[in-house]
């Protein structure tokens, strides 16, 4: 028995579709049987309200006492909270403990390695990489900038000073530059110069304060719609009647627009 925990069926579906050792998939997709007789059991708990992490944490705390067929063998994590598990005894060195080789890992992106490494030890690996991007509404870009051409829009938004200038121009025409408070957060937080925690000291990187300053300015001047990531207003702003210039996404986010 191989137990794999996920928060949706993305990894499960790719495993079932492309792993050459798959022999049979249960009608309800709860298990996958491999050609060597191994049964892969899938446990899927949705992300909402921290549900996935809560249930995963509870199960991991019971690992030592769990029956062999109930122990978690593989679990998926997101970059936002990967280090919580990487920096724990619940994860293994993928080379020395699991047996992956340098050749197995040679094509990984460095940033996907870094997020699952601690003290030089890699304790996970990624099956996907989703770079960040800024998706904009072409009709609004054309109204504000006079063009919807991606190269020209990119040039107009190529640094924060330019981005802020366009936000002012968009507001003058009745648009919001961003939907909410945390839309730009990852652009700043993913470019910090040092970790949040140093020993027992919490450090707030200057780049985080730049995000705070920008968010306050956008809120005070009406450049955002005062939404929060994933809430109903944020979702509506992406709809056909939305008045928001654009959204910071990863590549998978495009599918939800």
What are these regions (language model features)?
Residues 1-83, 102:
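Conserved N-terminal structural module of periplasmic/extracytoplasmic solute-binding proteins
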Residues 2, 36-40, 68-73, 121-122, ...:
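Loop/turn elements at helix/coil->beta-strand transitions in domains of secreted/extracellular proteins
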Residues 7-8, 77-81, 130, 181-184, ...:
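Beta->alpha turn/N-cap motifs
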Residues 12, 16, 20-21, 213-257:
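Extracytoplasmic/periplasmic substrate-binding proteins
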Residues 14-17, 85-90, 146, 190:
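Short, solvent-exposed loop/turn and secondary-structure capping segments
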Residues 27-51, 67, 147-153, 200, ...:
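A local structural motif
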Residues 49-92, 105-124, 161-173, 236-238, ...:
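Pocket-flanking alpha-helical
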Residues 95-106, 113-184, 196-229:
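Helix-loop-helix "hinge/cap" segment bordering the ligand-binding cleft or interdomain interface
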